[in-house]
Amino acid sequence: MLKGFAWIISVGNELLIGRVVNTNAAWLAAKLTYLGYAVRRIVVVPDEENEIVEAFRDAMERSDVVISTGGLGPTPDDITNLAFCKALGVEAEVNEEALRMVREKYESRGYPMTPEREKMAKMPPGAVPLPNPVGTAPGILYQRGDKVVVLLPGVPREMEAIFENSVEPLLKSRGPPVYFSEKVVVVRGVPEADIAPILKEVMKIDPRLYVKSHPKGFEVGAPLLHIHIYASAGSEEEAQGLVKKVAERLVELLKSRPGAEVSTS
C-alpha cells in the first residue's frame, strides 16, 4: 500500500568526490518509506546548473514527490533554487516572506544583508518558504497539481528540522494513512544461497511484503544473515499481523535447515 513514488536529489560536488557521506539521502529515504512513499531514485548531481535542471525535470516527470538537499546557501556554488526555477521555465523572484526570514537571522547576529544572502530568498513564483529553525537558508515548498517538490539545505540538522516541522505533516496528510511494521530474523549456520528458495516462497504471501537478507558473516565457513521483513497496510494492526505471520513461517522454514540457529528481534 503506497501513497506514491518519490525521488531524492542530492546536490553537491563533495558527495561525488567521496569527501562527504550522503547521510541525508538515507535519512530521507527511511522517512519517506514510513510515510508511505516508495523511493524510486536517489540521484546525486554536481553543483552544475544543467545537471540540477535535468535532475528536477526528470524527477517531476516520473514521481509524485521530489525532495532535494543542498545548494541553498549564499556561496557561488549554491544554485539549486535558481536551477529549479530554470527547470520550471520561470524566473526566480525574491520571496518577501523568505527575505524576512533570512534578514532576521542575519540581523539578529549583527550581520548586514548582502546580495549573496538575498539570493537565499529567491524561488519560483507561488513557492512557499519553509522556516529553518537551526540555520539561515529557508526550505522551499512548491506544488504543481498533485506534484510536491521540496528543496532543503544540505546541512543535516537543518534538513532534518525543516523536514520534521514542515514537510512531514504535509506528506502524512496526503492520501490514505499507511502504516509500516518490521522485524528482523537472525539465522546462523546457513549460507545465503541456500535460503534463497525460502525467501522466494514467503514473499509470495502478500504483495505488501518486502523481505531482504543482509549477510553479516562469511558465506562459506561462518554464515550469519539478518533477514529484514517489512510490510505496509492501512492499519497498524494489519501491518503488524502480516509481519508476524511471515516471520513465523520464515522461522519455521529456516529451522528445517540442518545446522540453522534462528532468532528474532
Swiss-Prot record:
- Read off the PANTHER family from this record: NICOTINAMIDE-NUCLEOTIDE AMIDOHYDROLASE PNCC (PTHR13939), NMN AMIDOHYDROLASE-LIKE PROTEIN YFAY (PTHR13939:SF0)
Please report any disulfide bonds recorded for this protein chain, giving both cysteine positions.
Answer: none
**Family annotation (Pfam families):** MoCF_biosynth
InterPro entries found in the cross-reference section = CinA, CinA_Arc, MoaB/Mog-like_dom_sf, MoaB/Mog_dom
* Family, similarity comment: Belongs to the CinA family.
Matching CDD domains: cinA
Q: What is this protein called?
A: Protein Pars_0096
SMART domains tied to this protein: MoCF_biosynth
